[in-house]
Swiss-Prot record:
Keywords: Antibiotic, Antimicrobial, Disulfide bond, Fungicide, Immunity, Innate immunity, Secreted
Entry function: Insect defense peptide with a broad spectrum of activity against Gram-positive and Gram-negative bacteria and fungi. No activity against S.aureus. Stops respiration in bacteria but does not permeabilize their inner membranes.
Residues making up the signal peptide according to the UniProt record: none
Entry text on domains: Four regions are important for the activity: the C-terminal loop, the last three C-terminal residues, the stretch of seven N-terminal residues and residues 8-9 are necessary for the antifungal activity and dispensable for antibacterial activity.
Name this polypeptide is given: Thanatin
GO terms under biological process: defense response to bacterium; defense response to fungus; innate immune response; killing of cells of another organism
Disulfide bonds: 11-18
Superkingdom of origin: Eukaryota
Membrane-crossing residue ranges in chain numbering: none
Organism: Podisus maculiventris (Spined soldier bug)
Subcellular location: Secreted
Amino acid sequence: GSKKPVPIIYCNRRTGKCQRM
């Protein structure tokens, strides 16, 4: 079976925001 590439989520602890890399 083929798996979808898992999006890497980077969370910045300073701003408290998470963004996809």
